[in-house]
Regions:
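Mature-chain termini and adjacent capping regions
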Residues: 1-8, 13-161
């Protein structure tokens, strides 16, 4: 049993990080319309919105970007069950992308955290996670998935060896 636990810990201790160069790239945003409030740093992009920064791509019907004097704090992508928000980014030392979908995706740039709410799904390398909510710590390569409170949406983890 201890050997199995050690094997699992070793398997999951392989660190996979998003590309560090992405943070140094300019952010490009496209949408059908935009609302900008310079005083508060709140920006809302509506209608087939897309954010690009290096290999990072977020798409949704609505994307909200909160900025401060240092730059972007958070990006929130709002989709629906029928057309979820999407997040894609290259990973260091990996041929595959991090891919995520959910009704609501919040990317906390400063903390390096991605929060998925509502039919959350994440593919990292050859592994996939799904549940009602999902938290992905980019900097520490940790995933926390939770089932729905009513128990209708259980957590699922798939390892593709």
């Amino acid at each position: 049993m201890n050997k199995l636990i050690l094997l699992i810990v070793l398997f999951f201790s392989t660190f996979v990080f998003a590309l560090s160069e992405d943070a140094e790239q300019p952010i490009e945003i496209e949408a059908e319309s935009v609302m900008v409030d310079d005083a508060s740093g709140y920006n809302e992009f509506i209608g087939d919105a897309e954010v690009r920064q290096g290999s990072l791509v977020m798409t949704a019907e609505i994307i909200q970007v909160q900025t401060n004097a240092d730059g972007v704090e958070t990006m929130v992508a709002k989709g629906t069950l029928e057309q979820p928000a999407k997040y894609i980014q290259s990973q260091e030392n990996q041929a595959r992308f991090i891919e995520a979908t959910a009704v609501l995706i919040t990317y906390d740039v400063n903390e390096g955290m991605i929060f998925l709410v509502g039919d959350a799904y994440l593919v990292q390398g050859f592994d996939s996670f799904s549940g009602d909510t999902l938290t992905y710590d980019i900097n520490n390569d940790k995933v926390l998935v939770k089932s729905s409170e009513d128990g209708t949406k259980r957590v699922k983890f798939t390892i593709d060896l």
